[in-house]
UniProtKB/Swiss-Prot annotation:
<keyword id="KW-0963">Cytoplasm</keyword>
<keyword id="KW-0716">Sensory transduction</keyword>
<dbReference type="GO" id="GO:0005737">
    <property type="term" value="C:cytoplasm"/>
</dbReference>
<dbReference type="GO" id="GO:0007601">
    <property type="term" value="P:visual perception"/>
</dbReference>
<keyword id="KW-0844">Vision</keyword>
<protein>
    <recommendedName>
        <fullName>Calphotin</fullName>
    </recommendedName>
</protein>
<comment type="subunit">
    <text>Homodimer.</text>
</comment>
<comment type="function">
    <text>Plays important roles in both rhabdomere development and in photoreceptor cell survival. Might function as a calcium-sequestering 'sponge' to regulate the amount of free cytoplasmic calcium. It binds 0.3 mole of Ca(2+) per mole of protein.</text>
</comment>
<dbReference type="GO" id="GO:0044297">
    <property type="term" value="C:cell body"/>
</dbReference>
<dbReference type="GO" id="GO:0030424">
    <property type="term" value="C:axon"/>
</dbReference>
<dbReference type="GO" id="GO:0051208">
    <property type="term" value="P:sequestering of calcium ion"/>
</dbReference>
<feature type="region of interest" description="Leucine-zipper">
    <location>
        <begin position="816"/>
        <end position="858"/>
    </location>
</feature>
<dbReference type="GO" id="GO:0042052">
    <property type="term" value="P:rhabdomere development"/>
</dbReference>
<dbReference type="GO" id="GO:0005509">
    <property type="term" value="F:calcium ion binding"/>
</dbReference>
<keyword id="KW-0106">Calcium</keyword>
């Protein structure tokens, strides 16, 4: 029967949407019952009235599927719980559900006393039905809205719940808990929608639901397990709340599980509000809201809750009070989620059950459906975790106070409508457990935590037996995870921004990099100092160019600094948008700031600028080069000025001889041609030069003798008057031997000889005189060439050495008409050089001819 009923319950839970309306009425009843402490009178009144309604609703919803299973399980527990309750639920089966609400209504009236006895009785019998009791543990879930799935199971736990009620009875709050069972009215509303069985189940139904609950319990435990962790926290609040939520039903039912699962969800989820009703109506509301939610995610967890509920039932009674405050806090998030959960279950089951749910779906159908959607809900919550967190926060604030005082009345209706209205929030079903963790953490955290909470729920489902002990750790864990998600959540949101920020920061970084490049360009400007080096060579221009590069550096540095500032300013701006991650961007900004600082430093140092120039900004360097070129051109302009100053020194020479430079150059040419007719000798001289290079290699050792010969020639002029002939002989003798050799160096010697002579003359006479001499010499040479060659050439053929020097010297003395020894010596040297040149040229020709012959025979020289 039970299995069969379970399938139908599936459709019934779907009808959960109908439950919302039923919830409204029962909620009012529940609020009086659960809140009995304050509105005890209204509770008494309304409970009586609602019981009929509950009865009517319950039979419609729960009666059909749940009755048989409930009767089976309930018979045993009912005996222990209370004969009236057992009798009523068992016979009605389908309708008994409605009657149990009536009995329940009575119980609410005598909530404290009647409930406590049933609880005491039930706990013992319930032990055998623990499986259903887990469902009761689900009622805690139902508090969250998941329990509804375990509605009937919760009923059995409700029997266990009475034990909790004693604890509640002991404490004023406990009494409210007992009232919560009395809240059966509330349950009735819930039951009417989906958990009608739960109402009676708590007191009367408990016997009947156990069978049905057992089946769903197995499924529900999963949800319960997740809830259990949260319950640990929430459980405390239920007691403190003294709300129907505390409704020991959950706590008592699975004292541990119920408090854990129910408390968190009861106080946490609207379930507490409606869940409070749910606990009482654990079977009722759970079917509608909690059942759908709990069923989907938490059905597996319920099983563990069952065992726990039995074991920790007593403990739970004590425990709930401690967590009492937390459930309230948690309740807000749970409240929001509970409706959503209900809606989830509704969404899942609604299509098939929509019409049937109105009557039957709540009790057994809910139980049956709960297992199936439970898993689905579990999955969904993870997906829609984001949406869930938002809803819980909104509902959370009101549900807590309302749950405490009027939770059944106000919250239940709103919760149920959302359940029916918003089937989509099904995901919230999972979230309901998660919301407890959010209670400890901010709502946003809840959103993040929700997915994580779901995993926690899965773990409880894995170890249902361990759920009690694991529940507490899990509870702590969800908050921890919640806190972690909190931290994670902000980063998650921020990361997207930080990503953009990082991009911006990167852009900013790049921009600062560009400024450094400009800085390097500034360094390049400093490097441009090379123009300064040129200026140093120039001496005076150095000063003007130095300021010019400074200006360039300043100008470049100013734009660079501005650019760096502009870049750095945008960098902080980009960094500012993300407060958290702005740090990275500020750091980047700092880097560019430091870059401009080095800029001034490289200016003085040239080495550093040279390095950065090639490194980062060749383009900038080019620009800097252009800028530098400008000062360079300026320095060049100054250079001509300096040259103008040097010309001043030349001007000193100009007054003496304006044409001197030209003439001096001419004398050089003349010196080369002095020996013989310039026109004729020039061409051979070129040839001789080329040949001389070759001959020089062979005649290197012979070069030395000509040097002393030359020295002798220089000495000869000193003894001009004495033996000119002797000099001629000496000169002729060595000339003959080394002529070929000397001819090789004849030209270099020629250039050297005048140089040596010039310093001598310079020592004796001023430069002007030397210039004049250079001028005079050519004339003398010309004269000698004209006179001597024509007349003496034949003499040379006979005895060139003897006649030529004498003839030359005599005319020089005649022409000079001076007694200046220096001039005479110079004339003599020039004459001797001319003779040597003539002889050497002739001999060079001979040597060249010989060399050509040798080359023809031996080939080109290879001694190089």
């Amino acid at each position: 029967m039970e299995p069969g009923t379970i399938p139908s319950p599936v459709s019934a839970p779907v009808a959960a949407p109908v439950t919302p309306s039923a919830v409204a009425a029962p909620v009012q009843v529940v609020s009086p019952a659960a809140v009995a402490p304050a509105p005890a009178a209204p509770i008494a009144v309304t409970p009586v009235a609602p019981p009929p309604t509950l009865a009517s609703v319950q039979p419609a919803t729960v009666t059909i599927p749940a009755p048989a299973p409930i009767a089976a399980a309930s018979v045993a527990p009912v005996a222990s719980v209370a004969p009236p309750v057992v009798a009523a639920p068992t016979p009605p089966a389908a309708s008994p559900v409605s009657t149990p609400p009536v009995a329940v209504a009575q119980i609410p009236v005598a909530v404290s006393a009647p409930v406590a006895p049933p609880v005491a009785a039930t706990p013992t019998p319930v032990a055998p039905i623990p499986v259903a009791a887990p469902v009761i543990a689900t009622p805690p879930v139902a508090a969250s809205a998941p329990t509804p799935a375990a509605v009937t199971p919760v009923v059995s736990p409700v029997i266990a719940t009475p034990p909790v009620v004693p604890a509640n009875t002991t404490v004023p709050v406990a009494a409210p808990v007992a009232a919560v069972p009395a809240a059966v009215p509330v349950v009735a509303p819930v039951l009417a929608p989906a958990v009608a069985p739960a109402v009676a189940p708590v007191v009367a139904e408990t016997p009947a639901p156990p069978p049905v609950a057992e089946i769903p319990v197995a499924t529900i435990p999963e949800c319960v397990a997740p809830l259990i962790p949260e319950v640990s926290v929430v459980a405390t609040k239920p007691l403190a709340a003294a709300e129907p939520v505390v409704v020991a039903p959950p706590a008592t039912e699975t004292p541990v599980v119920a408090p854990a699962a129910a408390s968190p969800h009861v106080s946490v989820a609207p379930a507490v509000e409606t869940a409070v009703v749910a606990p009482v109506s654990a079977s009722t509301e759970p079917p509608v809201a909690a059942a759908t939610l709990t069923t989907a995610p938490e059905t597996p967890a319920l099983a563990p809750v069952v065992a726990e509920s039995q074991v920790a039932a007593n403990t739970v009674v004590a425990t709930p009070p401690t967590p009492a405050p937390e459930p309230e806090t948690i309740a807000p998030p749970v409240v929001a989620e509970t409706p959503e959960v209900a809606s989830v279950a509704v969404a899942e089951t609604t299509p098939p059950v929509v019409p049937p749910v109105a009557a039957e779906s709540i009790p057994a159908p809910v139980v049956a459906t709960t297992p199936v959607p439970a898993t689905l809900a579990v999955t969904d919550p993870d997906v829609t975790a984001s949406a869930v967190p938002e809803l819980p926060p909104v509902i959370a604030p009101s549900p807590v106070p309302s749950a405490v005082a009027e939770t059944p009345v106000d919250l239940a209706p709103p919760v149920l409508p959302p359940v029916a209205a918003e089937p989509v929030p099904a995901v919230v079903a999972e979230e309901t457990p998660e919301t407890p963790a959010p209670a400890s953490a901010p709502v946003t955290i809840a959103a993040l935590d929700i997915p994580e909470v779901a995993p926690v729920i899965a773990a409880p489902s894995d170890a249902p037996a361990e759920a009690p002990s694991a529940a507490a750790p899990i509870v702590s864990t969800p908050p921890t995870t919640a806190s972690v998600p909190e931290t994670t959540a902000p980063p998650a949101a921020v990361p997207t921004e930080p990503i953009d920020v990082s991009v911006l920061s990167e852009a900013a970084i790049e921009t600062p990099v560009a400024p450094p490049v400009e800085v390097t360009t500034e360094v390049a400007v400093a490097d441009v100092a090379p123009p300064e080096a040129a200026a140093d060579l120039i001496i005076e221009p150095v000063e003007p160019p130095a300021p010019i590069p400074d200006l360039l550096e300043q100008t470049t540095s100013v734009p660079a600094v501005e650019a760096a500032e502009s870049t750095s300013s945008p960098i902080p701006e980009t960094s500012l948008p993300p407060p958290n991650e702005a740090v990275a961007s500020p750091e980047v900004a700092v880097a560019p700031i430091t870059a401009p600082e080095p800029i001034p430093e490289p200016e003085p140092s040239l080495a550093t600028p040279t390095e950065p120039i090639p490194v980062e900004a060749p383009v900038v360097i080019q620009e800097a080069v252009d800028a530098v070129e400008v000062p360079v051109t300026e320095t060049s302009t100054s250079i001509p000025e300096t040259t103008v100053e040097y010309p001043v020194a030349e001007k000193v020479l100009d007054p003496a001889i304006t044409e001197a430079p030209v003439t001096t150059q001419e004398p050089d040419v003349a010196n080369i041609n002095d020996g013989a007719p310039a026109t004729e000798i020039t061409t051979p001289a070129v040839e001789i030069v080329t040949a001389a290079a070759e001959v020089s290699d062979t005649a290197i050792p012979l070069i030395d003798p000509p040097v002393p010969q030359e020295i002798a020639v220089a000495e000869i002029p000193e003894t001009e008057t004495k033996p000119a002939e002797v000099i001629v002989e000496q000169s002729t003798i060595p000339i003959e031997a080394p002529v070929p050799e000397v001819s090789k160096y004849a030209e270099p010697v020629i250039s050297e000889a005048p140089a040596a002579e010039v310093p001598i003359t310079a020592g004796d006479n001023p430069d002007n005189t030397s210039v004049g001499i250079s001028e005079v010499v050519p004339t003398i040479a010309e004269k000698a060439v004209e006179e001597v060659p024509t007349s003496e050439i034949p003499e040379q053929s006979s005895s060139p050495s003897d006649s030529v020097p004498v003839a030359k010297i005599t005319p020089l003395l005649r022409d000079l008409q001076t007694t200046d020894v220096s001039l005479l010596a110079i004339a003599a040297t020039l004459d001797a050089i001319g003779e040597k040149l003539k002889d050497q040229k002739a001999r060079n020709q001979q040597v060249m001819d010989r060399l050509c012959e040798i080359e023809k025979i031996l080939g080109p020289p290879k001694s190089n």
